[in-house]
Amino acid sequence: MEWSLERMREWVAGGMQSVRECESSALGTALCLALLFIWYCYRVGCEHTSPSLRGGFSPEPRVGAVPGVLASELSSRGGSSKLRQIGGVGGGGVSDEELNGFAYCQSSECFRCTKPGEGLNQRLYHSLQEYAKRYTWAGMGRVHKGVREQGRYLLCSRPSIQKPEVFFLPDLPSAPFFSREAQKHDVELLERSFPALLAEFESVYRLPSSRTGSSLPPGWKANSTPRGQWWTFYLVNQGTPMVLNARRCPRTWRVLGQLRTFIANNVFGNACFSVLSPGSTITEHYGPTNVRLRCHLGLKVPSGCELVVGGEPQCWSEGSCLLFDDSFLHTAFHDGSAEDGPRAVFMVDLWHPNVAAAERQALDYIFTPGR
């Protein structure tokens, strides 16, 4: 085989052309990958937009230490859940949510009621990482999954019978109503304490004189309703003790301290007397989370009163507890007459029995104030 300078020149030129084509192809591939990465980051950012958390709650346990709590000067916030009025009541327009049969809470004092905001998912994940660094990742599988998927879950616009508005813990058994056996100790304690709780309710529930010009007894909060009146007297509001109210109900406060599963140290915990006047309806709404069971102890229950959770109706009875998951769509109404008087219950939030102790500790840490 003969070698010539011309032949060698052709081979060199061909090789250089091949190199240039390879460089061009590699550059194009790199640009495509960069664009795909930018698009992916944009989609992930959009999916993790979620409601902002509000609150001012201490991570330290407070319900058990009654004297110290009542002596300290704690800031109190109202616990009203002001729901949009529907059906033309109040002169406002009807929103898409109201046309679907429920309305979102509008209270600026309630962390559940705030508008969706930027960064909650990132803050929750950061808090979970802080907790795991300080303690452990052991037992955090469901909490980690709930935080990771929270933004996507909350942005889902599909109608649902269960849709907690702040945090969903996956793989929890769910039902609108639970048997009293789910929290047997605390249910029995509350029912044994019925006479004391009823007496203290009657001591604080005093209709003000018309001469005072006030529409509420001292310490009570009014909640917006489509019709009628719904009042609440909080001893613990979103994890914060209401000091002045607690001083007026010392026996009820002691009962709270004896409950084994009361959510005392995060924003999902409340305890209050709740009054519904005759002719009142509470607009259908969702609670903030599925990690709790809401317990109602009937204090005064006239005829014509009903609680509907997830489409299932139940009636209260005096001296007995109802346990339900308020992350299901729920409402309550009092269709009795003025002569029947108000419906009154003692409401307290207990842990869902299938939330493990390690998960409770982590959720107390994550859902403390300022996080």
From Swiss-Prot:
The keyword Methyltransferase does not apply. Residues 1-25 are extracellular. It comes from the Eukaryota. Its main location: membrane. It is a single-pass type II membrane protein. It holds the Pfam family Asp_Arg_Hydrox. InterPro entries: Asp/Arg/Pro-Hydrxlase, Asp/Asn_beta-hydroxylase, IPNS-like_sf. It is an enzyme of class 1 (oxidoreductase). Residues 43-371 are lumenal. The keyword Lyase does not apply. Its EC number is 1.14.11.-. The chain crosses the membrane at residues 26-42. Keywords: Dioxygenase, Membrane, Oxidoreductase, Signal-anchor, Transmembrane, Transmembrane helix. It is found in: Membrane. GO terms for cellular component: membrane. GO terms for molecular function: dioxygenase activity. Belongs to the aspartyl/asparaginyl beta-hydroxylase family. This is Aspartate beta-hydroxylase domain-containing protein 2. The gene is asphd2.
